């Protein structure tokens, strides 16, 4: 009985992670804003308003990420700083490998749909992103 319970618990834990395919990677393109961050100790930090959001542009398995600032008229302000990225997909696991002049790091993609992105970095911080809703003042 204990073995069956263990297998059920283990199966449910392992099934929480989405198997990422090359076809899923195109969902990464576009604008993403942080919704929350889950810390290794289980605490969560919620983000109600974001001053900057991330813009991803992927072609094949290479591309870049830029930080952009949404404006009240629905446009975005950006600068020339970008992080070059390479996407590595193997056996259903996918990582985003970032590189700048000053550093390189990677994040594991936990979930990726057209409206949701969850990544985990090397410090076990889990970032939950959603598509931003454009706002404007008229």
Over which residues does each language-model region extend?
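Short, exposed beta-strand-loop hairpins at the edges of beta-sheets
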Residues: 106-109, 115-128
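C-terminal motif of bacterial Sec signal peptides marking the signal peptidase cleavage site
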Residues: 12-15
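An anionic, turn-rich surface loop/hairpin at beta-sheet edges
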Residues: 76-110
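N-terminal helix-cap/turn-to-beta initiation motif at the start of protein domains
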Residues: 18-33
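Positively charged n-region of N-terminal signal peptides that target proteins for export
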Residues: 1-4, 18
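Short hydrophobic/aromatic-rich beta-strand segments that constitute the beta-sheet cores
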Residues: 34, 63-67, 94-98, 117-121
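N-terminal glycine/threonine-rich, aromatic-flanked beta-hairpin/loop signature
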Residues: 45-89
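Short, low-complexity, Pro/Ser/Thr/Gly-rich segments in the mature regions of secreted, periplasmic
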Residues: 127-138
């Amino acid at each position: 009985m204990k073995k069956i319970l263990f297998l059920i618990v283990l199966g449910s834990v392992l099934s929480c992670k989405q198997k990422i395919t090359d076809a899923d990677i195109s969902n990464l393109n576009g604008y993403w804003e942080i919704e929350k961050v889950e810390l290794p100790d289980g605490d969560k930090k919620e983000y109600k308003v974001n001053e900057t959001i991330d813009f991803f542009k992927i072609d094949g398995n290479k591309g870049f990420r830029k930080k952009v600032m949404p404006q009240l008229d629905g446009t975005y302000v950006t600068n020339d700083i970008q992080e070059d990225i390479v996407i590595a997909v193997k056996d259903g696991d996918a990582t985003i490998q970032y590189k700048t002049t000053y550093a390189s790091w990677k994040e594991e993609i936990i979930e990726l749909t057209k409206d949701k992105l969850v990544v985990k970095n090397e410090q076990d911080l889990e970032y939950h992103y959603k598509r931003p809703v454009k706002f404007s003042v008229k």
